[in-house]
């Protein structure tokens, strides 16, 4: 009984996190709308999001100049210091400069994806890229592993060779791939980048999810985590599957563009525009997207997850 009680206590203490890769709002003339960004950050933190991942894919990070990445950091920092600051890019000098500038901010850490586009980069050079960032960073460094987008898989074995990561965001649907980071790097914080694995991650001993859908359904993602941690698995999965339906609907029209529409629909405020070549949805696409998710919203209201 004593051992069982200790296990139950450890289970309750281990609380995985929901991290939002925060959307970057742009004006019609393609500038960052800092006021909208702050409103969004405030809402997310108020609704229980644990940290904000700034300049990620959902935030259209690859389209941002170094100056804009820093601008995003400053705007979000006005709201919270619970920030992982993504600095990566194709110019290592820019990434180094951003990492060094982050010393002026009391944040959680910096992150970087692997250098993308360039084919057949050697593992040796990828390792050198990340080790260089670790050497100059005043904060803990997180790996952002997104093989589909970057063409490089910095898997658990390579991460162990690099040897300086505090954590990883692994954007891949294969949970075994993500679990391998914890197996080979037991002291590393391991986050899944999949929205569809929130309930699963909360049940596996991993450290949480970096979930794009938490931009527009923070209440849902936080509740899925809570239910899973309370071992109310049936309820957690019921909510997870509703969340998955919204994610699937967003992908029909392009998830990066849909995120702006869905945030306005579910959260009630406007996040402006994405940045081309991520174009905004046209009126008909918006109408079709909302039609696909309005029944889900009604169910979430019925479950008292969302307000009327």
Curated annotation (Swiss-Prot):
State a single Gene Ontology molecular function.
2-dehydro-3-deoxy-phosphogluconate aldolase activity
What catalytic reaction does the record list? 2-dehydro-3-deoxy-6-phospho-D-gluconate = D-glyceraldehyde 3-phosphate + pyruvate; 2-dehydro-3-deoxy-6-phospho-D-galactonate = D-glyceraldehyde 3-phosphate + pyruvate
Would the keyword Transport turn up in this protein's UniProt record? Answer: no
Give binding positions for substrate: 57-58, 144-146, 169-171
Q: What is its EC number?
A: 4.1.2.55
This protein's UniProt keywords = Carbohydrate metabolism, Lyase, Schiff base
Pfam families on file: DHDPS
Annotated site location: Proton shuttle: 144
Instruction: Report the domain of life of the source organism.
Output: Archaea
State the pathway, as annotated in the record: Carbohydrate acid metabolism; 2-dehydro-3-deoxy-D-gluconate degradation; D-glyceraldehyde 3-phosphate and pyruvate from 2-dehydro-3-deoxy-D-gluconate: step 2/2
Matching entries from InterPro entries are given as: Aldolase_TIM (IPR013785), DapA-like (IPR002220), ED_pathway_aldolase (IPR053415)
- Protein transport as a keyword? no
Q: Where is the active site?
A: 169
Q: What class of enzyme is it?
A: lyase
Listed SMART domains: DHDPS (SM01130)
Function recorded in the entry = Involved in the degradation of glucose and galactose via the Entner-Doudoroff pathway. Catalyzes the reversible cleavage of 2-keto-3-deoxy-6-phosphogluconate (KDPG) and 2-keto-3-deoxygluconate (KDG) forming pyruvate and glyceraldehyde 3-phosphate or glyceraldehyde, respectively. It is also able to catalyze the reversible cleavage of 2-keto-3-deoxy-6-phosphogalactonate (KDPGal) and 2-keto-3-deoxygalactonate (KDGal).
Family listed: Belongs to the DapA family. KDPG aldolase subfamily.
UniProt subunit comment: Homotetramer; dimer of dimers.
Question: Can you say what this protein is called?
Answer: 2-dehydro-3-deoxy-phosphogluconate/2-dehydro-3-deoxy-6-phosphogalactonate aldolase
Which organism encodes this protein? Saccharolobus solfataricus (strain ATCC 35092 / DSM 1617 / JCM 11322 / P2)
The UniProt gene name for this protein comes to eda
């Amino acid at each position: 009984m004593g051992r069982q009680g200790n296990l139950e206590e450890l289970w309750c203490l281990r609380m995985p996190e929901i991290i939002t890769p925060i959307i970057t709002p742009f004006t019609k003339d393609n500038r960052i709308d800092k006021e909208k960004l702050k409103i969004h950050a405030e809402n997310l933190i108020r609704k229980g999001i644990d940290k904000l991942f700034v300049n990620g894919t959902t935030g259209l990070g690859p389209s941002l100049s170094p100056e804009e990445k820093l601008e995003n950091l400053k705007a979000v920092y006005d709201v919270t210091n619970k920030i992982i600051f993504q600095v990566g890019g194709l110019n290592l000098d820019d990434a180094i400069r951003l990492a060094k500038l982050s010393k002026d901010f009391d944040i959680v850490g910096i992150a970087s994806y692997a250098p993308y586009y360039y084919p057949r980069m050697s593992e040796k050079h990828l390792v050198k890229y990340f080790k260089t960032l670790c050497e100059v960073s005043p904060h803990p460094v997180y790996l952002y592993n997104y093989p589909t987008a970057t063409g490089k898989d910095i898997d658990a074995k390579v991460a162990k060779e690099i040897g300086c990561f505090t954590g990883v965001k692994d954007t891949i649907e294969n949970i075994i791939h993500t679990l391998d980071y914890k197996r080979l790097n037991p002291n590393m914080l391991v986050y899944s980048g999949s929205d569809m694995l929130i309930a699963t991650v909360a049940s596996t001993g991993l450290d949480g999810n970096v979930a794009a859908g938490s931009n527009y359904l923070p209440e849902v993602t936080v509740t899925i985590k809570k239910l899973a941690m309370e071992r109310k698995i049936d309820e957690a999965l019921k909510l997870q599957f509703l969340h998955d339906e919204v994610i699937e609907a967003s992908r029909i029209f392009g998830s990066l563009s849909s995120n702006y529409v869905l945030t306005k629909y579910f959260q009630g405020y406007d996040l402006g525009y994405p940045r081309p070549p991520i174009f905004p949805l046209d009126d008909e696409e918006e109408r079709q997207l909302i039609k696909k998710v309005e029944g889900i919203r009604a169910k979430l209201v019925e479950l008292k997850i969302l307000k009327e």
